Amino acid sequence: MLRFMLKNRKFWLLLILFTVPLILMVSAPQAITLVGQGATFPEPLIMEWIIHFQERYRNITVIYKGTGSGAGVKAILSRTVDFAGSDAPMKLSEWEEANRKFGPIFHIPETMGGVAVVFNIPEVEELNLSGDVLADIYLGRIEYWDDPRIVSLNPGVGLPHERIYVVKRADSSGTTYIFTDYLSHVSAEWASTIGKTKTFSFPDAIGDRGLTGYGNAGVAQIIQQIPYSIGYVEFAYAVKGGLKTVALRNKAGNFVKPSLETIAEAAKYALSLPDPEESWHNVSIVNSPGENTYPIVSFTYILVYKYQDSPKICAALKTWLRWILTEGQQYSERLLYPSLPQNIVEIGLSAVERLQTNTGSEGYKFQLCLIFPLLLASIGIENRSCGECIGEDN
Amino acid sequence: MDPLESLSLFFSVMLIIVVLLFMGSMVLYSLPVFEKFGIKFIVGTEWNPRKDIFGALPFVWGTFITSTIAIVFAIVISYGAAYFIVEIAPPKLREFLSSVIELIVAIPSVIIGLWGIFYVVPLVRDFLKPLSSPLSFIPFLSGETSGYSLMAAIIVLTLMITPISTSFIKNALESVPMELKEAAYALGATRYEVFKIVSKPLTRRAALAGIILAYGRAVGETMAVVMVVGNTPNISLSLFNPGYTLAAVIANEFLEATSVLHISALIALGVILFVWSLVVNTLAILIMKRVRIG
Amino acid sequence: MRPSLRSLTDKFYTAFAIFAFLILIIPLLHIILSIIMNGIKRLDLELITSPPKSLLGSGGGILHAIIGTAMVVFIAMLISLPLGFFVGLYLAEFAKGKFAHFLRTLISVLAGIPSIIAGVFAYTVIVVVYGFSALAGGFALGIIAIPYVARSTEEALGSVPMEIKEAGFSLGIERWKVVLFIDVGYAKSRIIAGFLLALARVIGETAPLLITILGGINIPSNIFSPANAIPLVIYQYALSPFRIWHNIAWSAALLLMIIVLVINLGVRYYLKIKAIY
């Protein structure tokens, strides 16, 4: 049979048809992949960055999935990603746990954004609210749109006697964190009951008026579809969704609507930021002073490990992070994110320079970090945390 | 044994090894979550990855309710459509119509999901919900909806599986010997009566096999469902609420699982799904085997 | 004459049957129509020649996904064609009794696996070692394709008339030569048709790819790199909040439908020419 095969022309044709492409596909240069996960807040901007970055650096592939800031932090804590996105800085306890396992985690501000308070009242186009009224709406204290406290802030506006449907995020969200951080600043009761958090449950007073959505996109959709609802979304989602935004009373007493200018104002007041190798859990720029400042503003961060396992990934990360802090910023405003002020960019760049590789090890495969302990666990061996299972023994 | 036989035997054995490896590794990886929750995992009602609490019931329920209602619709529609093709449509059109029905099966499910997002979800939200609001005291039809719901999943599933059972029933009806039907006509039966008295009993087994196969397809369907069902792990009676199925949650959460237990739980759900499909498909084969002899 | 209950039920069932048929056909027509109407907008040269571009512009195309699909399907065929062919050959020509029964059951088991589970298998075997890659995706699709290839090969070889086989034997040709040249030669068109239909079946599979190839924006050149694929990019774009990507999703869907249709109709036509169908 072998002799026949070797003599047959068709056989050789088939062989070439199958093996030549295979050889080409195996020997071609392999791309370096950076995988990130986390906040949906900056997702449209990151998508745009990836497209342009890819055009410039063809051998580095960046993948980012918008799963929410909470999921991003969890991914960083279990080392299943190369970088994560979060609107909320890591909690002190989370940061210290990661520091113990992997070394310092840098918070690199990639952009900033505003959280717009959006509403859907068919009869009303413009709405003023103050921080404490907003807090009371979310605490369930204010039930109807024509509540005297809302009316007094909006003289002449015909507010209807309708129940307020209050929308929040269902998933663990940095956008929620920024929003509740603001509410904690403007309402003592909010600060003492719910505080600043990535996820909270509606107080009982909300009753059946509470709705939840997944991701910024989910909340935007609900506001679009349910009349007399109020919610909070990252500013770009409000504009894209054609949602009406609330003019919020800022620290100076003016009613300000979110816009590129009013959001960017807040960055001027980010006076001191911690060293990259420390925890950033106290960083907040909500309710900043200034006549024209929008009150609900925050940086959004890329979380990345200082100590990298693989030199290739380390170099690729540096290239990516440098690019988004410099060339990437030119795309921000077109997508309705204010570009970062230069001093913030410098802080980020200095952190990027400090990324370094652990000497010796070739590199972990983060998928191995889950399946390998899973295999051990299934045959009864205690599973250990990921940083230990691969890195230190090699 | 000649060289060809040994070569093909080699490949067959390789295949057997691969499949066994497959099944073995799935079971192995699902052990940790069963160790932690025991058999209660299957009936656990809470699925909270952030707290490492896992229970399969929301997905078992979602898969069950969507597939079952879909197959009920499919059975009713299939019989009618097959009857139409075989008995009512002009014979020349028959082949064309069958091809058209089979065309639906060839549409990739992600495309049906795409259509589902932009047409079925708004249909449920803006048409079916208002239409059924006088009936909203029935638990199945209660509640508000964004359109992403069990109902939307049922609609796309019905659309996807009905052609399968229709084809089976149609083929079975076509294979009923003409003499038997003519004998019935000669005795004065109406077209429907011929169907009811002659064709239906004879084709019962083949039809059943087709129905079960269609049900198996519904149980395992991933993409079209995950795009319209709302992806919320709760157990609700209302079809307008969002839900979750076994296949959908695995597709959604697998890449973002951040703990060993989470992946184990997802693979365990995969085992449940696999066993479910296996039972269904084996049933269909057993029934079909009887048909060949009988 | 007064219409009897019997003729009324007959008419009622006829009406019901027409209604049922319409319920089945009308959504199908709506799907096809909406794919065409929505997809024609971006069915242009840019769609198939350009990788994704800025969201502020036209959004670019899906070249990365087209190449990715080609790579993934190639690997899937590389795995499933030899394996499926020889298993089908074995079942049709050589297998006996219990082993044959066992093998056939195994093929049925494989055929009934929900595609997402094939993806999980590929993840635990390939992704864990080589990372997210076109190889992993191709492996998953290959697993899905094997039963289709095996069954159609077995059926094709089973359709060879005994006279042809016997003629070969009577000429003194060895067994394996009869099988390889005469049987396979006779059934060649059907076997190739089976290959093509398996290909058409897996080219639209999405679920296993979701968890094996990662779906980025890069144009893959190496099977160990992550990749994207046409059905996967449809999924990603459909779920995104960007209208530009929604349009591309519809056009990609139209493209995929055209490919699947061409293969299916092509196979039927091919079989008709060979005077088999």
Task: Label each PLM-derived region with a short phrase.
Chain B
Residues 100-103, 107, 111, 165-169, ...:
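Transmembrane alpha-helices
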Residues 70-101, 114, 132, 284-289:
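Transmembrane-helix boundary motif in ABC transporter permease subunits
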Residues 1-6, 28-70, 90-91, 143, ...:
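Periplasmic/extracellular loop-to-transmembrane helix junction in inner-membrane transport proteins
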Residues 1-12, 284-294:
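Transmembrane alpha-helical segments of polytopic membrane transport and secretion proteins
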Residues 61-66, 70, 74, 82, ...:
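Alpha-helical transmembrane segments in multi-pass membrane proteins
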Residues 11-28:
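N-terminal signal-anchor transmembrane alpha helix
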Residues 35-54, 114-159:
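Membrane-interfacial helix termini and adjacent extracytoplasmic/periplasmic loops
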Residues 225-274:
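Interhelical loop and adjacent transmembrane-helix boundary motif
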